[in-house]
Amino acid sequence: MNSENFRLSEKLVSASYVRQGLDARRGHEQLIRRLLDQGKCPEEGWSESTIELFLNELAVMDSNNFLGNCGVGEREGRVASSLVARRHYRLIHGIGRSGDIAAVQPKAAGSSLLNKITNSVVLDVLKLTGVRSVSSCFVVPMATGMSLTLCFLTLRHRRPKARYILWPRIDQKSCFKSMVTAGFEPVVIENVLEGDELRTNLEEVERKIEEFGAENTLCVHSTTSCFAPRVPDRLEELSVLCAKHDIPHIVNNAYGVQPSKCMHLIQQGARVGRIDAFVQSLDKNFVVPVGGAIIAGFDENFIQEISKIYPGRASASPSLDVLITLLTLGANGYKKLLADRKELYGHLAQELSALAARHGERLLKTPHNPISLAMSLNHLEAHSSSAVTQLGSMLFTRQVSGARVVPLGVQQTVSGHTFSGFMSHSEAYPCPYLNAASAIGITKGDVTVCMKRLGKCLKILKKEKSDPADLEAEDGELEESPQRSTELRV
């Protein structure tokens, strides 16, 4: 409906009623106009009707939705299922062109506009969460590991002689495989134990730079968000080292948008030294389905290089999901989710510490990790050599997801490299432990039920001379699950 159509409507319905409808329409259009003009996440969230109006307006700009379109090419946005078409709001062409994921498609002005506005809104959110000097970013329809691979492949063209990537150890398979998949040799830098925390071994990083030579080193691959007792890398010091030796620096910021501490580390690292790109997951930070990531950096030209190395067009689904989510939440709604997460981190730490004390364990002191917590399992291991691993399976079968039990002495081979003490980020961490995290979307009910079930499992495992059937019988029924929706309320 445009102004002319509203005027014609006055022949059929009272003019005062039509004008009221026109004013309502203009309210939606004003929000859309502001978004297109500023390219920023709106302060307050939009209604679903405004979002759907906007998406439908974008869809009619794509050639597959032209009323008189005649397509004779091999890719014409045809979809056999109307359900699939509705799932994608009839935005079928995806994003980018064969030579650049950020390029505009002549046949898909609406999808191209979706891509541009999503990248702009996401850039605004990265700034408001703490990395204020970030200059460019784009959403890529791959998860964190493959997005890191894309960054490494881009650096290959800049540093053709380079063979090695210096990587402070974090026991997570995808980030290790991202380097191997790109064709490089990871140089694993073992962490150093400071109190309970595992921290970056800066001296070893510098020794490896001198050993292999800066010209043979593709980059330093550091990490912010991670499982305790490992803590975020010393980004400022690593960034200074990279600037000193003229070595690129890629940061795995997988779920680091949530805590301001991780974003502050990136901002400070870029200020005092060198950070070329940082990569973050969409699902971990923006509560959307798995399948997308944000590649961001401080040099617009380098970020464009990364986007141009992506071969072919790409799915628009991750871009569509995160745009809908951020328009629904608005900047204020998203900041509230972050504030709630931070508050519940303190609550989780308090509850886990109290539970640990009741069972002769302790909460490991990891103040530099803003998301993940760890509770020792020394007494449980002393009671039974198999109890630690059994605890993990018991929690999973009792519908406690995300809790991570780490025994001692596990060996794991990943892409040809054998890690000792795998999952603990260290060859010889002093004790087994259990991880729990306060990530975006967690509720107080999650914490309460988790503590009840964990406490019951620990009590059962410490009962001596009980067979598995007895343990299951004593466990009884599951406590009532926290009443929750799959949708977040802000």
From Swiss-Prot:
Compositional bias segments (type: Acidic residues): 469-480
Give the Gene Ontology MF terms in alphabetical order. Answer: O-phosphoseryl-tRNA(Sec) selenium transferase activity; tRNA binding
Spell out the subunit comment: Homotetramer formed by a catalytic dimer and a non-catalytic dimer serving as a binding platform that orients tRNASec for catalysis. Each tetramer binds the CCA ends of two tRNAs which point to the active sites of the catalytic dimer.
* Protein's GO biological process: conversion of seryl-tRNAsec to selenocys-tRNAsec; selenocysteine incorporation
What UniProt keywords apply to this chain's record, in alphabetical order? Answer: Cytoplasm, Protein biosynthesis, Pyridoxal phosphate, RNA-binding, Selenium, Transferase, tRNA-binding
The superkingdom listed in its UniProt entry is Eukaryota
Which cofactor does this sequence's record say it needs? pyridoxal 5'-phosphate
Sites binding substrate sit at R97, S98, Q105, R313
Q: What is its EC number?
A: 2.9.1.2
Binding residues for pyridoxal 5'-phosphate? R75
Q: Which PANTHER family match?
A: O-PHOSPHOSERYL-TRNA(SEC) SELENIUM TRANSFERASE (PTHR12944:SF2), SOLUBLE LIVER ANTIGEN/LIVER PANCREAS ANTIGEN (PTHR12944)
Residues covered by region (Phosphate loop (P-loop)): 96-106
Site feature location: May act as a substrate filter by repelling compounds with a negatively charged alpha-carboxylate: E74
Q: Name one Pfam family in it.
A: SepSecS
Q: Which residues bind tRNA?
A: R271, R398, K463
The family note in this entry says: Belongs to the SepSecS family.
Q: What does this protein do?
A: Converts O-phosphoseryl-tRNA(Sec) to selenocysteinyl-tRNA(Sec) required for selenoprotein biosynthesis.
The biological pathway it contributes to is: Aminoacyl-tRNA biosynthesis; selenocysteinyl-tRNA(Sec) biosynthesis; selenocysteinyl-tRNA(Sec) from L-seryl-tRNA(Sec) (archaeal/eukaryal route): step 2/2
Which positions carry N6-(pyridoxal phosphate)lysine?
K284
Among InterPro entries, the record links this protein to: PyrdxlP-dep_Trfase, PyrdxlP-dep_Trfase_major, Sec-tRNA_Se_transferase, SepSecS/SepCysS
- Primary location recorded for the protein, binned into one broad class: cytoplasm
Q: What protein is this chain from?
A: O-phosphoseryl-tRNA(Sec) selenium transferase
What enzyme class is recorded for this protein? transferase
Using the UniProt annotation, give all residue ranges assigned to the region (Disordered).
466-490
